[in-house]
C-alpha cells in the first residue's frame, strides 16, 4: 500500500474511532464515517471494501490500543504481584475510558458483524501473550501460566463488565456499592486481589 493510501486508511480509522466514541455503534456506517471524515463513501469502499471490512479494521485498531497500553506499562519490578495488580487497574481504566470500544472488542454490539476468525485469533493472541508474560513472573511453578492468566482475565473482565453494565443503568437506591469511582475501584481491586491470591500468585 502506498504511503498516501495508508495515510488515508489511518485517517478513516481515526475518524471511525471518533464516531464510535461520540455517537456509538449505530453510527458506524460507511456513510457515517465518510461524512465525518469529509470524504465520499466511494473512498471508504475503496480502502475497506465495505462496512464489514471497515469494522474488521476498527476491531483490529481497538486491540492495537490495548496492546499499546500493555507494552507501555512500566518495566517489570522486583514486586511482580504489584506489577500485575497495576496492569489490572490500567485494564479497568481502559474499559471505562470507552465502554463502546470495549463492547466492540468483547461483545457483539453491531448487528450482523462478527470479526473475521483469523483476525480475532491474531489480535487476541498478541495481547494475551503480553498478559501471560506478566502472570508468568508470579505463577506457581506447578501451574500453567496460560490457564492461570485466562482465569485472572475472566475475573477482570467480569468485574469491569458488571461495573459498566451498572453504570449504564439508573442506580439502585439500596445497592451495596455506591455509584462512585472510589467505590467501584475498591471493589474491582479487592476482587482482582482475591483472585490473584486464590490462584497462588506470589513473588518467587
Map each language-model feature to its residues.
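N-terminal intrinsically disordered/low-complexity leader segments
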Residues: 1-7, 18, 77, 171, ...
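Generic hydrophobic, amphipathic alpha-helix propensity
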Residues: 8-16, 33, 58-62, 66, ...
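Helix-turn-helix
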Residues: 11, 19-53, 57
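Alpha-helical DNA-contacting segments of helix-turn-helix folds
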Residues: 20, 55-62, 105, 120, ...
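Hydrophobic alpha-helical connector segments
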Residues: 57, 71-101, 124-126, 142-152
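Amphipathic alpha-helical packing segments from all-alpha helical-bundle domains
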Residues: 70, 114-139, 146-150, 182-196
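Short secondary-structure transition hinges
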Residues: 93, 97-130, 174-181
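Amphipathic C-terminal alpha-helical segment
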Residues: 133, 153-175, 194-203
Amino acid at each position: 500500500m502506498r504511503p498516501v493510501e495508508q495515510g488515508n486508511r489511518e485517517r478513516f480509522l481515526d475518524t471511525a474511532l471518533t464516531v464510535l466514541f461520540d455517537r456509538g455503534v449505530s453510527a458506524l456506517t460507511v456513510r457515517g464515517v465518510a461524512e465525518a471524515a469529509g470524504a465520499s463513501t466511494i473512498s471508504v469502499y475503496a480502502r475497506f471494501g465495505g462496512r464489514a471490512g471497515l469494522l474488521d479494521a476498527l476491531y483490529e485498531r481497538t486491540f492495537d490500543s490495548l496492546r499499546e497500553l500493555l507494552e507501555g506499562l512500566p518495566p517489570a519490578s522486583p514486586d511482580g504481584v504489584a506489577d500485575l495488580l497495576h496492569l489490572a487497574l490500567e485494564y479497568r481504566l481502559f474499559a471505562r475510558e470507552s465502554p463502546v470500544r470495549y463492547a466492540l472488542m468483547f461483545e457483539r454490539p453491531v448487528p450482523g458483524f462478527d470479526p473475521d476468525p483469523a483476525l480475532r485469533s491474531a489480535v487476541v493472541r498478541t495481547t494475551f501473550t503480553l498478559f501471560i508474560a506478566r502472570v508468568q513472573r508470579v505463577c506457581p511453578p506447578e501451574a500453567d501460566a496460560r490457564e492461570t492468566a485466562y482465569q485472572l482475565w475472566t475475573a477482570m473482565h467480569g468485574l469491569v463488565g458488571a461495573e459498566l453494565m451498572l453504570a449504564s443503568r439508573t442506580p439502585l437506591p439500596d445497592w451495596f456499592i455506591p455509584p462512585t469511582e472510589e467505590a467501584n475501584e475498591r471493589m474491582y481491586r479487592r476482587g482482582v486481589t482475591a483472585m490473584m491470591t486464590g490462584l497462588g500468585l506470589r513473588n518467587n
